[in-house]
Swiss-Prot record:
A cellular component term, taken from the record's GO annotations: cytoplasm
Organism in which the protein naturally occurs: Prochlorococcus marinus (strain NATL1A)
Purpose of the protein: Cell division protein that is part of the divisome complex and is recruited early to the Z-ring. Probably stimulates Z-ring formation, perhaps through the cross-linking of FtsZ protofilaments. Its function overlaps with FtsA.
Protein name per its UniProtKB record: Cell division protein SepF
Region described as Disordered: 156-191
GO biological process: division septum assembly; FtsZ-dependent cytokinesis
Lineage: Bacteria, Bacillati, Cyanobacteriota, Cyanophyceae, Synechococcales
Length: 191
């Protein structure tokens, strides 16, 4: 049969082409029944496949090249208390901040000029990572990474001891110069 005669038969709707195809004897119901009742291994494989987590890294795919940020975890946050004796220990403070640890820095063991230099250094590092800093006490500072929110909830409550002196405190605060730094002596300047 030529190609042209086949095309004519298709256009004319001739049933002659139906006999060209070989019929395969295939009973699909037998396979379905075998799968449902006798093939326990197949059903457990299907159950395993359907219950598998597609996002699980151990499912036959090579590990990802994504590197997580240091210090981010679902574990509790860590607070480090550091009492440096020299400026040489300040890079450890910056490293702790980079690892997203909150640092309480006690500078009472340092010389006043070294303590000022240390605070400036750590404050610059904290600023670079968008962190927060708070002065907690005399020569004691709190430095926190950006993932930690620092709030100052200390507000003086009214009590009988501070109610009587409240007016006098306001007057003395208005006339007093800037507060003294936490370290060293200050030289009084004439206004």
């Amino acid at each position: 049969m030529s190609l042209i005669s086949r095309l004519r038969a298709v256009v004319a709707g001739d049933d002659f082409l139906d006999s060209d195809f070989d019929e395969l004897e295939y009973d699909s119901s037998d396979d379905f029944e075998n799968f449902n009742r006798g093939n326990k291994e197949g059903s457990t494989e299907m159950a395993t496949i359907s219950q598998a987590n597609p996002f699980d890294g151990r499912s036959g795919f090579p590990p990802s090249n994504v590197i997580g940020m240091p210090g981010i975890s679902t574990n509790d946050s860590e607070v480090s208390l550091m009492e440096p004796r020299s400026f040489d220990e300040m890079p450890r403070v910056i490293q702790a901040l980079r690892e997203r640890k909150t640092v309480i820095l006690n500078l009472t063991m340092m010389e006043p000029d070294q303590a000022q230099r240390a605070v400036d250094f750590v404050a610059g590092g904290t600023f670079a990572i968008d962190g927060h800093q708070e002065r907690v006490g005399e020569s004691i500072f709190l430095f926190a990474p950006s993932c930690v929110t620092v709030t100052n909830s200390f507000q003086e409550e009214a009590s009988p001891s501070n109610m009587s002196n409240k007016g006098n405190d306001l007057i003395s605060k208005e006339t007093s110069p800037a507060p003294e730094p936490a370290w060293g002596e200050t030289v009084a300047t004439a206004l």
